[in-house]
Amino acid sequence: VTFIAVKGINKIAKITAVGGIAVMGLNLVLLLVSGAILLLNGGHFAQPLNFTLSPNPGYQSGMAMLSFVVFAIFAYGGIEAVGGLVDKTDKPEKNFAKGIIIAAIVISIGYSLAIVLWGVSANWQQVLGARSTNLGNITYVLMTSLGATLGQALHLTPAASALTGVWFARITGLSMFLAYTGAFFTLSYSPLKAIIQGTPKALWPSVMTRLNVNGMPAAAMWLQCLLVGVFIVLVSFGGDSASAFYNKLTLMANVSM
């Protein structure tokens, strides 16, 4: 990621655009398929709607519910990240502010709608309550359930329904790869630019503020790459299970945003 990112903002923009399209595609699939399942099942939800009580045992108290705020804020994390690219925007004094407002509205509606739509195909106790489900694979578990539920709603055979779920998971894997790749390219440059180039140069060693021929702080980006690699290695060999490892990585990403 760093090797390509140091070659300039144009490289980052092209890859990020592909990632954005992948995310939009996944959300569109969720919307259309959930709507189809809801119609085929006569408006029946796999997880009954309850706006006051969470099916997750970990969110039964008011204090526990407050911990969800971290994830709610993370939904807007990308907006903060692209703030470092405001100078790359055409007519930023007008277009950037407008883009932030539109993005915030879309995220708010989309985030809330997606939570409700997952209840169409996934029941907490049957799908998400398993010990094997964690923050690292939950998207694939949900999409597999979405595909399998669609097959059942279409009265396909159990084998065909399961195969539909498998293909949904495979397509999700490709889409998530593209989405995360785009996010990593943006996050490898934008926050670093805001920290280093947004503060007095006297605070940093000259090598950290030096730009390469593409206008990128290459030395700082490579140092960042090294530090991230070290932290990942330290966490991965901490002795916890893979599930706990994925949970830690996700929580680290949320806090960092």
Predicted regions and their residues:
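Transmembrane-helix boundary/entry motifs in multi-pass membrane transporters
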Residues: 1, 22, 153-173, 201, ...
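Transmembrane helix-loop boundary segments of multi-pass membrane transporters
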Residues: 1, 10-20, 171, 180, ...
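Hydrophobic core segments of alpha-helical transmembrane domains in multi-pass membrane transport
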Residues: 2-5, 24-35, 224-234, 257
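Structural signal for the C-terminal ends of transmembrane alpha-helices
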Residues: 4-9, 86-87
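Loop-to-transmembrane helix boundary motifs in multi-pass membrane proteins
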Residues: 90-93, 102-107, 181-185, 196-239
